[in-house]
Amino acid sequence: MPLEIAFATKKLRHLCESEEAARSSLGSGVAEKLKARLADLRAASCVKDLVAGRPRHLAGRRPTSLGINLSDGWRFVICANHNDVPQLKSGAVDWARVNRVKVVDIDKDHA
């Protein structure tokens, strides 16, 4: 079963669903990577399946969030979108069981 993808705002949804809007706001290279990463999300059955874009925890963000590289210093940020986020015994998010995500941001990586 593919990942369920939601969006934090209508603007983010539009940016992710309209190539023209993405190109206009982010530039062609970043828009192409965004399209590819969204295709990766749609093809994955869980977040743990994601490899491209170097998914990683982001300092200063909620532990249920991951940043995924796009291009030219841009990234998009997803978070687990479960009422009860699956957790490991350690308390960390069990990304192998997360099958619902929300795109919460597209921004320049300031790390």
Regions found by a protein language model. Give the residues of each.
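Arg/Lys-rich, positively charged N-terminal/basic patches that mediate binding to nucleic acids
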Residues: 1-39
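Lipid interaction determinants
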Residues: 6, 14-15, 40, 58, ...
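Short connector loops at helix/strand junctions that flank enzyme active sites
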Residues: 36, 53, 61-63, 71-73, ...
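Enriched for short, Lys/Arg-rich terminal
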Residues: 66-111
